[in-house]
């Protein structure tokens, strides 16, 4: 395809690992408009000097693109304040940004049903959660509650495996981990020793 034919760039999140190529993309796609939350607009200006060709999308707003409908869900502080998720209504794919993500080299496959060591990726998802998302456990639970009414067949995070065979598994894991950080805790002591 010719990038000049692109109409939109969806920015679910403004961290540079998600947006570092935006100026180049705008140059090669001169008709394209950026779709993002209102909170992302100042980031675009400060990080990249981009102040034009931006459309702020509202929480729950839909956009018909050909035979596809995109729906945008604001999920603030599921890592950063401007974060949103995008839902492909027809294919039931949730582009979840940093939520439901994981670490781990993909070893030649992208989907949960293709991999031979799913437990490894679940552990890598826990490592990712604890390092990237855990501080934002309450917003994670809020996002899960907000999205509870949509029919998700595939979860496509920005990092890690795409979950198409059992998307409910990664949702359940993230729910459990978020509840660890926000619910009742066990009293305990950790002893660290090094020599």
Please state what every model-predicted region is:
Residues 1-4, 146-151, 180-186:
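Glycine-rich phosphate/diphosphate-binding loops that line cofactor/substrate pockets in enzymes
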Residues 1-34:
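Active-site metal-binding motif and surrounding structural segment of the metallo-beta-lactamase
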Residues 6-14, 35-37, 94-97, 155-159:
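Active-site neighborhood of phospho(di)ester-bond hydrolases with catalytic His/Asp-centered motifs
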Residues 31, 35-157, 162-165:
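Metallo-beta-lactamase
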Residues 51-55, 113, 174:
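Short, hinge-like loop/turn segments at secondary-structure boundaries
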Residues 154-186:
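Terminal amphipathic helices with adjacent charged low-complexity linkers/tails
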Residues 193-195:
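Redox- and metal-dependent alpha/beta enzyme cores, enriched for Fe-S-associated oxidoreductases
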């Amino acid at each position: 395809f010719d990038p000049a034919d692109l109409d939109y760039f969806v920015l679910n999140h403004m961290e540079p690992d998600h947006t570092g190529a935006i100026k180049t993309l705008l140059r090669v796609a001169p008709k394209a408009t950026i779709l993002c939350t209102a909170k992302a607009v100042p980031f675009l200006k400060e990080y990249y000097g981009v102040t034009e060709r931006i459309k702020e999308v509202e929480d729950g707003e839909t956009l018909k693109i050909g035979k596809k409908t995109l729906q945008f869900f604001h999920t603030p502080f599921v890592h950063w304040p401007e974060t949103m998720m995008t839902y492909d209504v027809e294919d039931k794919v949730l582009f979840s940004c940093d939520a439901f993500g994981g670490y781990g080299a993909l070893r030649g496959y992208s989907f949960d049903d293709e991999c031979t060591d799913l437990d490894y990726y679940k552990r890598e998802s826990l490592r990712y959660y604890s390092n990237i998302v855990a501080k934002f456990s309450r917003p994670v639970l809020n996002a899960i509650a907000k999205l509870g009414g949509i029919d998700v067949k595939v979860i496509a995070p920005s990092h890690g495996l795409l979950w198409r065979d059992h998307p409910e598994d990664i949702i359940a894991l993230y729910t459990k981990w978020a509840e660890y950080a926000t619910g009742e805790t066990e009293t305990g002591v950790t002893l660290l020793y090094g020599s």
